[in-house]
Amino acid sequence: MSTKAIYPGTFDPITNGHIDIVTRAASMFDKVVLAIAASPSKKPMFSLDERIALAEQATAHLVNVEVIGFSDLMANFARAQQANILIRGLRAVADFEYEMQLAHMNRHLMPTLESVFLMPCKEWSFISSSLVKEVARHQGDVSHFLPANVHQALLNKLK
């Protein structure tokens, strides 16, 4: 039986922390869908199409990872993808309460949907897309935290 997992997020933009999580998930499951949420209410810096393209480039070396955009409820998307596993990253204890609420709601909506929590390696445990964008807006060097293609796209966006 093959296992298919979904790693959802806004990925605005995708960071090395996200790449760390999806790489480890790809070694655990037969197929991983990197599901990029449209999230218009978050007013993303990058369009959905841009985020998909950046993520596809950054994960091209992972043969069992597919990047797909979505705008539906996660449980509905998981059902449509015939996936029963959600991958979520936990950076700190502060993330846990919110992630637990999401996991319970997703399980209520789709009882067979299990959430699997992965912690990023220590090097990436403090970064978020929001923090990276904020530092970059103030001319801070964020190249260490992003795949090269994403770093260049961020610099271009901020010109």
Swiss-Prot record:
Q: Name one GO cellular component term.
A: cytoplasm
Tell me its cofactors.
Answer: Mg(2+)
Subcellular location(s) per record: Cytoplasm
The UniProt keyword set, sorted, is: ATP-binding, Coenzyme A biosynthesis, Cytoplasm, Magnesium, Nucleotide-binding, Nucleotidyltransferase, Transferase
Record EC number: 2.7.7.3
Q: Does the UniProt entry include the keyword Magnesium? A: yes
Q: What InterPro entries does this protein map onto?
A: Cyt_trans-like, PPAT, Rossmann-like_a/b/a_fold
Could you say which residues form the signal peptide? Answer: none
| Catalysed reactions, semicolon-separated | (R)-4'-phosphopantetheine + ATP + H(+) = 3'-dephospho-CoA + diphosphate
Residues annotated as binding substrate? T10, K42, M74, R88
Q: Does the keyword Cytoplasm apply?
A: yes
Q: Where is this site: Transition state stabilizer?
A: H18
Q: Which pathway does it operate in?
A: Cofactor biosynthesis; coenzyme A biosynthesis; CoA from (R)-pantothenate: step 4/5
Q: What is its main location?
A: cytoplasm
Any one Gene Ontology molecular-function term assigned to this protein's record: pantetheine-phosphate adenylyltransferase activity
| Residues engaged in binding ATP | T10, F11, H18, G89, L90, R91, E99, W124, S125, F126, I127, S128, S129, S130
What family is it from?
Answer: Belongs to the bacterial CoaD family.
Quaternary structure and partners = Homohexamer.
Q: What biological function has been recorded for the protein in this entry?
A: Reversibly transfers an adenylyl group from ATP to 4'-phosphopantetheine, yielding dephospho-CoA (dPCoA) and pyrophosphate.
Q: Which PANTHER family match?
A: PHOSPHOPANTETHEINE ADENYLYLTRANSFERASE (PTHR21342:SF1)
What this protein is called in its record is Phosphopantetheine adenylyltransferase
Q: Which gene encodes it?
A: coaD
